Design a protein with these regions (language model features):
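Exposed low-complexity, polar/acidic, P/S/T/G-rich flexible segments that act as propeptides
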Residues: 1-12
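Short linear motifs in intrinsically disordered/low-complexity regions
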Residues: 6-8, 25, 132
Length: 136
């Protein structure tokens, strides 16, 4: 249930918090007014940092079959972000461009204990999540 103030604004425990978003064009908001992160931040009075990249992939070095070349790697954005340390909430999205460009799916490691095969979507995602858990 949402609670509103006298001006009709939602009173939320998220108000004043920082939302960090990384991902591809879906997170970037290419075909909407700033993406779902902006919708969430605006609705709940949050500060938004959106470092999503149009065309980005989970798997490094995937050649885009439409545009050619690589268009950015989500884990690289996350790893190099200075804004991430200030985030209260993190939203990550990806995999669409990997699938579109036929990146190998891969298999899960056993409990984040093995080496990650970052040439696969699964390995790249595991590595990124492990880095996030370790560093943030």
């Amino acid at each position: 249930m949402e609670v509103f103030d006298i001006n009709g604004q939602i009173i939320s425990p998220l108000a004043g918090k920082t939302l960090y978003v990384a991902g591809d064009s879906i997170a970037y908001g290419k075909s909407s007014a700033g993406g779902y992160g902006k919708c969430i931040a605006d609705k709940y009075g949050m500060t938004l940092t959106n470092e999503a990249v149009d065309g980005a992939t989970l798997t490094p070095n995937i050649t885009d079959k439409v545009y050619g070349g690589t268009r950015g790697c989500i884990s690289t954005v996350v790893t190099n972000s200075t804004a991430l340390a200030k985030a209260d909430y993190i939203l990550l999205e990806g995999g669409v461009n990997d699938a579109w460009n036929n990146a190998p799916v891969g298999t899960l490691t056993d409990g984040f204990a093995a080496a990650y095969d970052e040439t696969t979507m699964t390995g790249a995602l595991e590595k990124m999540l492990d880095d996030l858990a370790t560093n943030h």
